[in-house]
């Protein structure tokens, strides 16, 4: 792969294409269920395309990423005056590129290899709409993350109450591209107020979707012994705002039109 395809659909496997067409009943509209906040699914991205995409990212973007490193503030301990009065702001370490910042070197590199166009494509928006089971606004945020050995994101909820468009929730869709040197990295999320749910996200082409806000964290990436320098997990990320309340129709209409097609234009 010399460039990313113009359409996200061209990365998908047959199962992924079925989601896009509204024919995968288990996944289409899954996040319209008010009891469900998160889904993780493998096999939706073609394995060969996933490997090629990861190699392309290594060559084109790795050198241009920005490091995000927000450690736990020491005053969370030194300023404590009462027993059991702990507080923990979001702590994290990873590398990233915000692709909307077009003057940045990473954004320019992403544009040159077609990544920005693919993440802004109609089919990526339609794929997200199919999982959400509801209308999404057409313009969405795009970002790339890269976790190396030991990189993580601590407990956080991604709630943005000061932003009117996102205050009542929004959708994140992540495409995971882990190298063979990665042993594991887990996503842990809260259910009924407790961190009881866990899934390994160190996949090559796995898809995760988040109906935010909810509490979750990403564990430190663990490399296979002796392969720390080669252990990376890329994440292609889209952030989508809701365009309308959820529809009761999350499955294909009687005429066969998939939800993704009906709601792709907000």
Which residues fall in each region the model found?
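Catalytic core of Fe(II)/2-oxoglutarate
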Residues: 2-6, 145, 150-151, 157-161, ...
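Non-heme Fe(II)/2-oxoglutarate
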Residues: 2-125
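Conserved double-stranded beta-helix
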Residues: 68-188, 213
